[in-house]
Amino acid sequence: MSRFDQAKMLLKVKKLQKELQKQVIEVEKGEGAVRVEITGEQKIKKIHINPEYIDLDDIGQLERWLEDAVKEAIQASQKLAAEKMQPMMGALGDLGL
């Protein structure tokens, strides 16, 4: 791969990274009790807890909803990133990355 092609590919990768920064995935658990927002870069943007659905006598349930929502959000974000990167994977190997 020529240096020009390498430079073009690196620009595409940087553009993709910026796109992933802007994309937000939302996951809800507990019928809306907990909502997690995460970017395509696997960065938690926001965690929202709806107090109307929370039983203070069962904090364990809230913890499970939070844990499940965060895990699912991370998995969805990883899947999104992998799908976006797939077309570039062969060319990235040529760059030695």
PLM features: what roles do these ranges have?
Residues W65, A69-L80:
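Stable alpha-helical structural segments in soluble proteins, enriched in small hydrophobic residues
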